[in-house]
């Protein structure tokens, strides 16, 4: 057991370093069902000094310059344009779709999105850190396997397997960009 001041110092050190790390999917996570059913599922987290609402996190995540590039690609690749205002509506809970995703489930501190083909899930969650030292931001993904019509076996497919390294790096970049944006916003207030 560590003291409150040690916990605060640990959060400050992690937030200052901008560390994004792989972490277990929390037991209460909306994404957990996919890990349990054999889908590929991952989870990354980072800590932010200060109180960050789930709404603020979702909006920051989908409006970073990194994610805006993905939105631009989706606009042309699958004819699914999106705006910062739509990201804000998604964050506020007044929209059930955004770019190439639709809301599969949401709670006070979580959002689970499904892509337009039903193969991938994106998940965001916030959780307060012990002693009010800050907020933990989570980002995870799931890829639902397809069933081979001949063998009946499930598999993720060669395209996903080939892109897994990129996916892991990109996930860390996205979460780091959201964390940086939120830290900047918190510093301005």
Regions found by a protein language model. Give the residues of each.
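Hydrophobic-ligand binding "helix-grip"
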Residues: 93-133
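Short aromatic-glycine motifs in intrinsically disordered, low-complexity regions
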Residues: 84-94
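Acidic/polar N-terminal loop/beta-strand segments that form early-domain functional surfaces
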Residues: 49-51, 116, 142
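Beta-strand/loop substructures that line and gate deep hydrophobic ligand-binding cavities in soluble
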Residues: 118-165
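Hydrophobic ligand-binding cavity/cleft-lining segments
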Residues: 4, 8-84
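Intrinsic-disorder/low-complexity, polar/charged segments enriched in Ser/Thr/Lys/Arg/Asp/Glu/Gln
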Residues: 39-45, 110, 134-138
